[in-house]
């Protein structure tokens, strides 16, 4: 069970009964030092539901041949995971932690046990799926765009989930290899896009991080993109 300060930090998406909330909090686990296997192999995403307390994660949907077909960014205050009891050898998601990540995790073992006691939990499950719907739909639209726009969209989504002081240049702790894995774009093509954007003065490359030096200019790259489900440019806090 987590302490009272962490309990108050959780946003449940919908109003839940005091009984269910208390039972959920009783099985909540704080995850602060995630192993590489938990992140890279997405074990934590397939073994329950997690609330992002700090940091950012990207969730990528893959086909069985490991080709990325969709990706979304989840930041502080967001939920992700798989609460389906169906055990399958095929695990379609992989996740990448951007910077330091802290989670409050609810294991499937505990969630399924609680579901037998209180059907209200399914209302909560439904709210979690609705919470990511717009991101997944926008991600599907982005897959039809060219490489440059897909990379820019990812960078702006990451910026939207980065806490900034007024006037501060966003620093995204991500490598070009990670961008390749997340977007499904070949590493060489990602390098070409990043170099082009740097040449235009829109970003600056450092070791394992990228500074977004011109957010407005990057945003212009998406002017002709259909952002009807989600526009990260409107969500950047700066």
Region spans (language model):
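Cyclic nucleotide-binding regulatory domains
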Residues: 37-99
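Cyclic nucleotide-binding regulatory module and flanking cytosolic helices
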Residues: 1-38, 80, 84-86
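Short loop/turn microsegments at loop-to-beta-strand junctions
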Residues: 28, 46-47, 170, 188
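Phosphate-/nucleic-acid-contacting segments
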Residues: 160-238
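Polybasic "coupling" helices that flank or enter modular domains
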Residues: 120-184
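Long cytosolic regulatory regions associated with cyclic-nucleotide signaling
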Residues: 1-2, 83, 128, 145-152, ...
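Cyclic-nucleotide recognition modules
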Residues: 71-128, 134
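A residue-level structural signature of the nucleotidyltransferase/glycosyltransferase Rossmann-like core
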Residues: 49, 71, 103-104, 171, ...
